[in-house]
């Protein structure tokens, strides 16, 4: 298996973390992977908040009140600039969410390479999150992920994936 496929297979949604903060060097490499992520017309309509402050972490955890989230020593919150989205002319569809998703997955894969766990979270109170981060109107929270070393309770549940013939249509 290639290194990349192995990395893709390693990445999992982690819902239990050790209290130890990731190293500064590991976070720097994760941040660099995010910085290198592509976006439509290279607009890069994003900003990422890396949060380790206990008070702010507690407030952000209240926007997605799940007990497991409070085990994370740090969070990344990904926000998009709605004024900087590339918009497809054919149907006026803004691509900020897509661009941000690409960057967040870069984050998750880079974290996995560092031995860190992450978990995509999109079902949170974005208005409360925006208030915690003191965002102006042009910035909108899209996703957040805890980041840290997987805890003892973390178990890879054996992700089930659809077979290739249900995913791909080859037109040859």
Question: What are these regions, as identified by a protein language model?
Answer:
Residues 13-29:
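A short N-terminal beta-strand-loop micro-motif at the entrance of redox/enzyme domains
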Residues 26-28, 32, 36-103:
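Glycine/small-residue-rich phosphate/adenosyl-binding loop
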Residues 34, 76, 91-132:
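Small-aliphatic-rich amphipathic alpha-helix that forms the alpha element of a beta-alpha
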Residues 47, 124-126, 143:
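Residue-level "edge-of-site" marker
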Residues 73-75, 118, 140-142:
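Structural motif
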Residues 80, 123-124, 149:
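Short secondary-structure boundary segments
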Residues 128-142:
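Short, electropositive alpha-helical surface patch
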């Amino acid at each position: 298996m290639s290194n990349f496929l192995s990395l893709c297979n390693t990445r999992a949604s982690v819902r239990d973390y050790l209290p130890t903060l990731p190293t500064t060097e590991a976070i720097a490499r994760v941040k660099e992977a995010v910085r290198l992520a592509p976006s439509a017309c290279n607009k890069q309509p994003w900003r990422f908040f890396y949060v380790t402050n206990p008070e702010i972490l507690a407030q952000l955890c209240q926007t997605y009140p799940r007990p497991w989230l409070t085990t994370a020593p740090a969070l990344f919150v990904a926000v998009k600039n709605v004024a900087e989205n590339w918009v497809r002319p054919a149907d006026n569809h803004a691509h900020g969410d897509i661009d941000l998703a690409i960057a967040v997955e870069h984050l998750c894969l880079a974290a996995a390479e560092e031995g860190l766990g992450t978990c995509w979270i999109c079902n949170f109170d974005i208005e409360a999150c925006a208030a915690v981060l003191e965002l102006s109107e042009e910035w909108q929270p899209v996703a957040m992920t805890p980041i840290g070393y997987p805890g003892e309770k973390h178990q890879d549940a054996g992700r089930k994936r659809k077979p290739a013939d249900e995913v791909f249509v080859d037109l040859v």
